Structure formats: structure tokens, C-alpha cells
Amino acid sequence: MELATPRFRPDPSLSREAMETLQHDIAAAASFENEASPSPAAIRDGDALVAGVDQAFLDDRAVSAVVVLRGGEVVAREHAVTPLSIPYIPGLLAFREGGPIIDALSRLDVEPDLLVVDGSGRIHFREAGLATHAGLLFDVPAVGVAKRLLCGEPSRTVASLPEGTRVPIEADDSMTAADGTVVGYAYQSRQYPDSKRINPLYISPGHRLCAETAVDCVAACGGEYKLPRPTRLADGHADDLKARYGDG
């Protein structure tokens, strides 16, 4: 894969103010509407390539893993190991982890139709989470799948939701989006039938998808567990790589 908009490449040496300014520019350039994005049916039927993106961490390095699937079957894997130069700062994750992700995606010999990124998309203070940044850099439809809610407010409680339930996440006053804008969904991908102990995922469009389609695409990715199959496999690949490089 090649970068489509290299001017948005995250630079960890920037000041915090400059990072936030770049994120405003990214949000303005990104699209949160369906634009040449794969349909959920294409994902289910194997007519679209879906890349799961996740990371693991050593003391001073990030291990970025990408697993590409077609119809649930793995067709490609890539990774990159890159030094970490700044600490974790809420809302500025792309400046810490974006470089390793770019390196891993750039090594792919296939062109994914969708990126499924472990992290937020539009559910972000400046509407420019990791999935938005990555999707715009490569100009590929992207969706963010987060385990925790960074910002915004659920329109109703997300406690003990039945499997398959979707609850809109609305922008609040910590975000640049207008209050009440639906920026994503809490999605109960899996649930125990007798003990509702699994928390929902927080799904948001990264680039070239609307919020509703983002959830539809994640649901179409399938998987037996809470995480969609692409990011679950990327998570496992990242953990295996961490063990390999950690021993070195």
C-alpha cells in the first residue's frame, strides 16, 4: 500500500498544539459518509479484502500487526517494529502508534477494501482518532473498534445489553462535533445468555463510511468472540510477534 496523503503523516516531534491542529485538518479532510466503501454483503461473501490492525508493546517499541482476510480466511500478514518516542496521551494516540501502523500497512502487497483498526475513529475529541488518521493517510475506508469509550455519551444505558444491540453514541461538549451528532455506536457483539457480563464495543467510522455502515461492516466480519475476526487475529499476531521480539 502507498500513502495517498503523506502531508498527514503523524510526526511525534510536533508540539501538542501542532498535533491538535493537524487533527482538526484531518477531521476536515476525512469523510464520514459512504464513499466507495465495501458493502456488508461483500465482506460476508468474500468479495472484499478486510485488514485488521492491532498493536502490542515492548518497553520502548511498538509491534504493529496487520492481518488481511477474504471471506474470513487469511490471505496476507505483515508487521513492523518501530521505536516509541512519546508516551501515551489521550486523544493523540496516532502520534505514538501511527508510524508503526503506516510501516506495517506499507509492506502489504494487497490493497484492502476496508481497514478495521483497534482504536477510535470519529469517537474522538477532534473527530480524528487512530482509524480516521490511518484511513485518510491511505484513502481507504476505515472503521475504529474500541473497547472503551473515549468521549461522547450513549443515548441510553449500555449495561447488560442483549447480543446484537446497538446504542448510538452522541457527541458531547468535549468534542468538536455538534452536540447530539451520532458519531458511532456501542455494539454488543457477543453476550453470555445467562449472565450479561460482556461489555459492548465502541464502533465509529474512520474514513469513507457513515456510523451505521461502520457497525454493519464490523458485524459482517463475523467471529466467535467479542472482537471482530480481523482485529482478533491481528491482536493474536501482535502478541506472537511481541513474544518473538521480546526474547531477542
Curated annotation (Swiss-Prot):
One of its GO terms (molecular function) is deoxyribonuclease V activity. Keywords: Cytoplasm, DNA damage, DNA repair, Endonuclease, Hydrolase, Magnesium, Metal-binding, Nuclease. This is Endonuclease V. Mg(2+) binds at residues 54, 118. PANTHER family: ENDONUCLEASE V. The gene is nfi. It catalyses: Endonucleolytic cleavage at apurinic or apyrimidinic sites to products with a 5'-phosphate. Its cofactor is Mg(2+). It is an enzyme of class 3 (hydrolase). One of its GO terms (cellular component) is cytoplasm. GO terms for biological process: DNA repair. The record marks 88 as: Interaction with target DNA. Its EC number is 3.1.21.7. Belongs to the endonuclease V family. It is found in: Cytoplasm. It holds the Pfam family Endonuclease_5. DNA repair enzyme involved in the repair of deaminated bases. Selectively cleaves double-stranded DNA at the second phosphodiester bond 3' to a deoxyinosine leaving behind the intact lesion on the nicked DNA. It comes from the Archaea.
